[in-house]
């Protein structure tokens, strides 16, 4: 649930093979009558020649300049390459320089080597600011949810100071709901059944998070959960398609694209569900109801009042859902695939189950039990190391011209990212391409304070770094550990005969392959949890 961190915008987009070249744009007859086809063509070609922004004051090398003399064709090809081949572009760029430029949907961005991570994280003139909103076209109706990324403190502060403090109180809710949700997905069949880890993780974690964010009644409303999970997935896909167009044409395209119209309907329908709940609470409170609600509806309102900062309750809830649903479900889905890929998976499964049983036999699900899941913590961090949420991370906007410590110049107005490659650096991680389950357990035993799943360091930027690191990572870690514990104790898990599926690449995002499958079979758990 990272706010202002592109590694967790997560999330939640279609793979490149699903992105369509926008050549199917249908203009309504009325628009042609008003504007005239010649006028539209003139606008199109003026934009093509004059407005595509490859102009950049930086002298850093440009990795994907595109081909062609006409700006829009060159820009389209560069954006298409960015969407489908960013990992290759980053590798190519780093082979040439420690700082380089990449043509992206929102202009030309600067990508820096990992050694700059701490400096970028702490620099006072580099902030998430407007870049998230620009990436997701927040000025266009249907995408206004993203306007709060990096600009509003209400959400991040609510998560940091209120959600995190409630983790102990929320654990009973998570542990009670998880087995019911898991059983509804994987059933109790004593024979092997093929399932989607991606769909299972999203189903369970979206419902758990909804109960925490909006309370019992609305959190169990299937329409609410459907709207938020659908918006989560479709908004990123729609933004990817929209970003293939020049910025000046995107508002027009968004008015005509069915996918963008659907986003506007989701926001309208979600507001119709949330507003009555808020109004009912406020009405009851004004008539003496002293009931305390322990959910994000109240946390956001309290934080807004304390800070004197306005917020939109609906858009804030939708942004919370985007961060939480994707971050947690992507991590859980990927770790299931990584575990099944191990040749010694059965041995590792026994070790994980032994740890779960040992941790829970005392007081059950409490903070101590969750902290004692050390091997599981290491497994999750190792999975995130091998498949982070994004190819580049820590997006920052330069509010003025900056000179880094080695003299590298960052022009004012630039968008800067860190290449997310340190987690495969053999100087930091021996056998960097291997999944080693106890890699971080061993480091913890040696006193490495950065070896915890929730720890943020320049060597492992899974949850960001510095003051803008993901504030919801503690909740996400607890949530995933609880669900994974139920899965491992209650089910045998393996790959089907066709084996693993590689992650999908879509722009900056590295996504757990939504087409991947695993096989599950009910087993008798050693203890009741």
Swiss-Prot record:
One GO process term, biological-process aspect: terpenoid biosynthetic process
Pathway given in the UniProt record: Secondary metabolite biosynthesis; terpenoid biosynthesis
UniProt keyword list: Heme, Iron, Membrane, Metal-binding, Monooxygenase, Oxidoreductase, Transmembrane, Transmembrane helix
Cofactor: heme
Residues binding heme, per UniProt: 470
Entry's Gene Ontology cellular component terms: membrane
Molecular function terms from GO: heme binding; iron ion binding; monooxygenase activity; oxidoreductase activity, acting on paired donors, with incorporation or reduction of molecular oxygen
Membrane topology, as annotated: Single-pass membrane protein
Cited InterPro entries: Cyt_P450, Cyt_P450_CS, Cyt_P450_E_grp-IV, Cyt_P450_sf
Bilayer-crossing regions: 31-51
Entry's localization field: Membrane
EC numbers, comma separated: 1.-.-.-
Annotated family: Belongs to the cytochrome P450 family.
Record function comment: Cytochrome P450 monooxygenase; part of the gene cluster that mediates the biosynthesis of calidodehydroaustin, a fungal meroterpenoid. The first step of the pathway is the synthesis of 3,5-dimethylorsellinic acid by the polyketide synthase ausA. 3,5-dimethylorsellinic acid is then prenylated by the polyprenyl transferase ausN. Further epoxidation by the FAD-dependent monooxygenase ausM and cyclization by the probable terpene cyclase ausL lead to the formation of protoaustinoid A.
Further information: In A.calidoustus, the austinoid gene cluster lies on a contiguous DNA region, while clusters from E.nidulans and P.brasilianum are split in their respective genomes. Genetic rearrangements provoked variability among the clusters and E.nidulans produces the least number of austionoid derivatives with the end products austinol and dehydroaustinol, while P.brasilianum can produce until acetoxydehydroaustin, and A.calidoustus produces the highest number of identified derivatives.
The protein's name: Cytochrome P450 monooxygenase ausG
Organism whose genome encodes this protein: Aspergillus calidoustus
GN (gene name): ausG
